[in-house]
Amino acid sequence: MAKDTVLQLAGNIPVIDVITAGTQASATLYQRIGVIATPATINSQAYPRAIHQINPAAQVYAQACALFVPMVEEGFIEHPALELVAREYLQPIIKKNVECLVLGCTHYPLISKTIAKIIGPQIKIIDPAITACEELSNILRANNTLN
């Protein structure tokens, strides 16, 4: 696995990755966790595996959202078509009564307003990029290198 190689090569240098950051934030606080990501990420089972390492009892519901990346890259950030597509992708996750939704792709925060509108305020959105930055800040603070 690529992460293992990076960790080995890094030695004592801390390594932060978005999957670990997103799973830490979700699996330590929630039991019913939704994950949306690209088909490749969903098929890899990376998020459910990582979540279950932290919280074996967690129920993880994953949904591939194949059209989100092309829509973001085409600039359909606040386009009505995005909302229609997002409703289709998110309905199965909403029906599972998840407590949080992990944005499992770095493109997805760009459409988080649309996602939040559809899932409602009762489902917490977890942006792994933000949690990775928080982890970096904690590491820098712990090593007294935060300036």
Which residue ranges define each predicted feature?
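Non-catalytic structural scaffold of enzyme domains
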Residues: 1-147
